[in-house]
């Protein structure tokens, strides 16, 4: 869909996008697995380089359908290539809910972001948390950012305003927002009015996190067993800063700020 020209203003910006699907059925038409990928209209440069042109408003992209068995990895690669050839920023969505195997989607370099929190499927069936897969990819050396989303359906349970990203962009323009997303200059939030990450500073081997009042800060690291740390507030209190000294063997770090209700903000 593309509603930019209907709703865009100086204070509100629509990012045109589409979700494409592939479905593996059993012989009784029961859903075995799915791939869902989002394509968000990229920067002007990405649009100009789109090999297949751009998707149009209300254009339907037919789902890929298979029965019994499939090469799930090749399907993911083909779907990502289709979105990339149409000038899109690409996210891979809700792998736990989709019941896919890691080898079917843990592929470096073909999509920009892995959805680690899906508010709809958290409320539907408790299958919306996906950080384990993200860490698997990061531990394997695949550089991929993460995102949180509502996946809003307005169905039988609340699924709006519970998953979103906070972007550090120069201004509210399409290219500035997309450049920030491409470069990972944002953090993701799970939960209505969840925590805020104000700043992450790496000074030499010291990591310092500043955030809104939370119950704990997890500094998660790649490397040896036991890498990273958790800083918890004293019982009944909250913290707004946490720090850790790196030992130099970490392969990556990321931050989680968690409040007393379990609402979480994730850095890239």
Where are these regions (language model features)?
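A metal-dependent hydrolase metal-coordination microenvironment
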Residues: 1-89, 93, 100-102, 107-109, ...
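Charged catalytic cores and adjacent phosphate/nucleic-acid-binding surfaces used
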Residues: 27-42, 99-268
């Amino acid at each position: 869909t593309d509603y930019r020209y209907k709703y865009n203003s100086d204070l509100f910006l629509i990012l045109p996008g589409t979700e494409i699907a592939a479905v593996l059925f059993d012989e009784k038409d029961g859903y075995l697995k799915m791939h869902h990928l989002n394509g968000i209209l990229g920067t002007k440069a990405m649009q100009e380089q789109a090999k297949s042109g751009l998707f149009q408003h209300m254009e339907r992209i037919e789902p890929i359908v298979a029965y019994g068995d499939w090469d799930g990895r090749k399907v993911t690669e083909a779907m990502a290539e289709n979105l990339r050839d149409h000038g899109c920023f690409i996210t891979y969505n809700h792998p736990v809910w989709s019941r896919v195997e890691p080898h079917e989607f843990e592929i470096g370099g073909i999509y920009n972001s892995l959805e680690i929190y899906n508010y709809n499927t958290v409320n539907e069936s408790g299958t919306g948390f996906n950080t384990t897969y993200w860490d698997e990819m990061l531990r394997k050396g695949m550089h991929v950012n993460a995102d949180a989303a509502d996946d809003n359906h307005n169905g039988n349970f609340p699924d709006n305003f519970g998953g979103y990203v906070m972007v550090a962009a120069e201004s509210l323009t399409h290219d500035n927002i997309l450049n920030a997303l491409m470069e990972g200059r944002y953090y993701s939030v799970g939960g209505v009015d969840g925590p805020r990450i104000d700043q992450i500073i790496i000074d030499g081997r010291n990591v310092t996190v500043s955030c809104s009042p939370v119950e704990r800060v997890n500094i998660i690291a790649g490397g040896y067993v036991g890498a990273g740390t958790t800083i918890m507030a004293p019982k009944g209190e909250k913290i707004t800063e946490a720090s850790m000294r790196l030992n130099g063997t970490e392969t990556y770090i990321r931050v989680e700020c968690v409040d007393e209700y379990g609402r979480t903000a994730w850095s890239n």
